[in-house]
Amino acid sequence: MADRSAIQLIDEEKEFHQSALQYFQQCIGNRDVGLDYHVISVFGSQSSGKSTLLNVLFNTNFDTMDAQVKRQQTTKGIWLAHTKQVNTTIEIDNDRPDIFVLDVEGSDGSERGEDQDFERKAALFAIAVSEVLIVNMWEQQIGLYQGNNMALLKTVFEVNLSLFGKNDNDHKVLLLFVIRDHVGVTPLSSLSDSVTRELEKIWTELSKPAGCEGSSLYDYFDLKFVGLAHKLLQEDKFTQDVKKLGDSFVMKGTENYYFKPQYHHRLPLDGWTMYAENCWDQIERNKDLDLPTQQILVARFKTEEISNEALEEFISKYDESIAPLKGNLGSLTSQLVKLKEECLTKYDEQASRYARNVYMEKREALNTKLNSHISGTINEFLESLMEKLWDDLKLEVSSRDKATTSFVESVAAGKSKIEKEFNESMETFKKLGLLISNEEITCKFSDDIEERIKQLCDAELKAKIGRIKKNLVPELKDHVIHLLSHPSKKVWDDIMNDFESTIKDNISAYQVEKDKYDFKIGLSESENAKIYKNIRILAWRTLDTTVHDYLKIDTIVSILRDRFEDVFRYDAEGSPRLWKTEEEIDGAFRVAKEHALEVFEVLSLAVTSDNVEIIPDVPMAEEESGEDNEIYRDNEGVFHSRRFAHILTELQKENVLDQFRRQINITVLDSKRSIITTRTHIPPWIYVLLAVLGWNEFVAVIRNPLFVTLTLILGATFFVIHKFGLWGPVVNVVQSAVGETRTAIKDKLRQFVVEDHEVKESFEMKDFSKNEQKEK
């Protein structure tokens, strides 16, 4: 190829072109391409029209074969061309990306004969460096193994995995299968399904390296299929099909756009040249690419085929034979051994005629697949056994005689029983060769049993703590509220004594020594101490919440008022007082007030009778770890202390005293008013005097019919309004009537003033007109 628009990137002697970077610089000039470029390769049989397709699609000038002269190899090595023009059905005016096209030497050519080393390395190189690999094939080649390059693709896939399979990225390559001379008799979907099935089958049969055993074909490749009409017999349709194909290379944002981000190598253009050269060097120098002879290839193919047939027969019998036996160890192991031996025997009978090293290699691989398949059943059996044994253990623990057997003893006995039965079953599988290694299973079993026992212990502990909490919290609340609602000077001594006794009563069953407890679930001394500490924390938090929620300002005022009224309103024997003089009221007031305020300071600050502040012996919250957090500010800007003993601030204390004084002052005033009312009531003789002196007027009224009628009407009206509470509507009606009357009067006055003003203006205008006439 002598065209100046392309260079031979890799020549026939497998040498990489050392001036590739200069070629790229010539193609792009001074433009900063960055990542806005794409690489496409074409791969296929010799003389299948690869170069022709590239020239029509990308407007390149690769050399093509003249079929009228001779069918021979045209492209030698790997050629590279640059283009920005793609043949499409639509005009794209915006700036198109730079595309670099690799034309790979055709496979299965007579020039190289049986030397297939270069074509396989070239195909591997194309996959390694390209975003899109166009696989050019004829429709009649689909279904063939050698003719459609499936054998070559299998080798390339395998080596590609070994070289690039462990890369920790999501890079993929698009395999674009272009089916030539597609006449449409067989739908494209059917052809694509056939090729896809062949590729998936090839992938499952690959010898995958460590770390890639579970990989899928679609982890590394995406598949697309396009059909093209016959170039000579259907030239117009061929051109139209190529243009439609070109649309997928330029129409960004569409579903069929081929240059997806995950295909790009994310390297600048000069970095790509270095990457491509390093890839070729790795492919060329890797010893694993020294391909075996055709005889070894045949042996590998046939032994793989025999192995797959034996494995398929094994799998077809497996589920039906094993399903009824999964719960019986003896029957299950016998059937597994039988099925495995039948599969290996069938393989040995047919595959032992081929090369021994290949035969043994595939036999080992088959044995591994069988063990892998069987291991699922073994794991399922062991898991089922584990669940059954665990259910038995839980039943034994829950139904034990708690008077003679402790929780710890029951769990320990059950654990020993589980381990013994599980290990015996696992050894049975191992002796029969069904289980190669039991270390992983044993480790998993040990971790599982320890985790389950821990969960069982946690559940038992949670139940015990729940029972303690269920009794402890309500008892504390009830006792504390009762003591605070009827406080004495030693109320905090009483509360703390009750607090300690309530805790002790609820956990006395677990006490072994003074301040030492054992909750009987197999915990260490430090763990038991931690649980005891948590119970005390719960108790202190309950006490703290109860005290501070109950002793609010209104509650304390109510307590003080009740203490005041107990002394002020009732005597020593509990009888209500009857006041006679104000001096008696004032004396009782002073005594009652002093009695009430005796507990005010007690309710403001939690201190014992020895005047020692009550401080919790355990941290009630994380905030208590630092002294800076003891004081906080509320939404109203008032500072408070988080310390348990500090109940009221100074400002709150003043508020309590103010409310208390107002309430007791009202009580005293009411008492004094009762004395005044008693003294100032109207004597009965006044009513007799009024009747005697007003008798004549009363008789005059009742003798006059008009007065009697008006009196009855007004009395009945007053009774109805008062009886049904209609004073509000009556007042509204009166107010409305008065308002309407006032408005009407204002309108009349306004109208009168306006009319008077208009009359005056008319007289003035007449006088003004007369004066003008006189002047004229």
UniProtKB/Swiss-Prot annotation:
Gene3D superfamilies assigned to the protein according to its UniProt record, in alphabetical order: P-loop containing nucleotide triphosphate hydrolases
Residue stretches spanning the membrane: 682-702, 706-726
EC number: 3.6.5.-
Keywords, ordered alphabetically: Endoplasmic reticulum, GTP-binding, Hydrolase, Membrane, Nucleotide-binding, Transmembrane, Transmembrane helix
Cytoplasmic side: 1-681, 727-776
Major enzyme class: hydrolase
Topology with respect to the bilayer: Multi-pass membrane protein
Domain of life of the source: Eukaryota
PROSITE patterns xrefs: G_GB1_RHD3 (PS51715)
Residue ranges constituting the GB1/RHD3-type G domain according to the UniProt record: 34-263
Nucleotide-binding in keyword set: yes
Main location: endoplasmic reticulum
One GO location term (cellular component): endoplasmic reticulum membrane
Topological domains, Lumenal: 703-705
Example of a GO biological process term: endoplasmic reticulum membrane fusion
Pfam families, sorted: RHD3_GTPase, Sey1_3HB
Gene Ontology molecular function: GTP binding; GTPase activity
Residues reported to bind GTP: G44, S45, Q46, S47, S48, G49, K50, S51
Purpose: Cooperates with the reticulon proteins RTN1 and RTN2 and the tubule-shaping DP1 family protein YOP1 to generate and maintain the structure of the tubular endoplasmic reticulum network. Has GTPase activity, which is required for its function in ER organization.
Complex formation: Interacts with RTN1 and YOP1; GTP binding is not required for these interactions.
Protein name, entry field: Protein SEY1
Species of origin: Saccharomyces cerevisiae (strain YJM789) (Baker's yeast)
